[in-house]
């Protein structure tokens, strides 16, 4: 019998386009050699253009799904995506609290790439107060970081630097914060990892990536799942963040456009590259 690969449990909503959501998590985790388990938090109506509606599942269903699989399978990490409701946030906080030694990676999704709202003030407060204190890493984009850092002081959002936001988020209890810069007006995309340096919270490293043309559906899900997968394989946080960004950038470089909306990251780009090389080799012989 083969050895069991690292197992990751993702809590996320569905996406019929497989660009984002639980389907994207499963693909990214599998591509990096993990075995994905999933708890469905909601059903969405969406395509590659945007999200039309979200139906959160009842919190009891979330609890039943998670408790049942966790009684059977040991997990190496938790990954959280779109949670759907305050009640779901609360029950998931209770679930992960029973596994304090398992890394908890949170992608705090507040809106779709098109700008469709997927959260509200009550959900944001619940995440900040119930989940972030338990988190190993949270991965907001710059817009989400500003909203979450000042969820109870909305007037401060527009006046704050991203570093100030990161420090406030670290103060909520997360061990690390990574703010992605795709929404910022910069030539390169700058992603910034924050955490404790010699006991003092602050910037650990800025990562600069070429800004690719186009708009992508599910890049955040891909990145956070990739970091989670790397941590499940035993990498340190800095190693995991670097490797996951490299993987995600490649998925975006190889992205395709199956519909009329955004591009979809190709989480199995390496498999198709291998196929091309193999076919080219066959032609040469």
Where are these regions (language model features)?
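Conserved phosphate/ATP/ADP-binding segment of small-molecule kinases
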Residues: 121-203
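Phosphate-handling active-site elements
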Residues: 33-37, 201-205, 230-244
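Conserved N-terminal subdomain of the carbohydrate kinase-like
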Residues: 2-10, 26-113, 273-274
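Short, small-residue alpha-helix embedded
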Residues: 146-147, 214-237
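Nucleotide and nucleotide-moiety/phosphate-recognizing core
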Residues: 61, 87-101, 128, 196-206, ...
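Short pre-catalytic strand/loop immediately N-terminal to key active-site residues, enriched for Gly-Thr
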Residues: 11-17, 203-217
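Charged C-terminal helix
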Residues: 56, 238-285
């Amino acid at each position: 019998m083969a050895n069991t690969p690292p197992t990751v449990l993702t809590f996320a909503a569905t996406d019929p386009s497989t660009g984002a959501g639980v389907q994207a998590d499963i693909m990214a985790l599998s591509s990096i050699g993990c075995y994905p388990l999933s708890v469905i938090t909601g059903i969405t109506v969406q395509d590659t253009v945007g999200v039309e509606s979200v139906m959160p599942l009842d919190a009891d269903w979330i609890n039943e799904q998670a408790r049942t699989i966790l009684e059977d399978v040991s997990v190496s990490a938790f990954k959280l995506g779109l949670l759907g409701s305050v009640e779901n946030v609360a029950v998931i906080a209770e679930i992960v609290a029973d596994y304090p030694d398992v890394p908890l990676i949170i992608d705090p999704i507040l809106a779709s790439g098109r700008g469709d709202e997927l959260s509200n003030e009550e959900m944001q407060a619940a995440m900040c107060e119930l989940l972030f204190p338990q988190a190993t890493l949270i991965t907001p984009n710059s817009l989400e970081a500003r909203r979450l850092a000042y969820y109870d002081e909305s007037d401060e959002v527009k006046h704050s630097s991203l570093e100030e936001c990161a420090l406030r988020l670290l103060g909520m209890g997360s061990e690390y914060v990574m703010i992605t810069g795709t929404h910022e007006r910069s030539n390169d995309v700058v992603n910034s990892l924050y955490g404790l340096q010699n006991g003092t919270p602050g910037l650990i490293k800025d990562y600069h990536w070429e800004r690719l043309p186009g708009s992508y559906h599910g890049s955040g899900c891909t990145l956070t799942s990739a970091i989670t997968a790397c941590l499940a394989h035993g990498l340190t946080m800095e190693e995991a963040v670097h490797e996951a960004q490299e993987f995600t950038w490649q998925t975006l470089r190889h992205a395709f456009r199956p519909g009329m909306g955004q591009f979809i990251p190709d989480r199995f780009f390496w498999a198709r590259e291998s196929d091309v090389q193999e076919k080219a080799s066959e032609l040469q012989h």
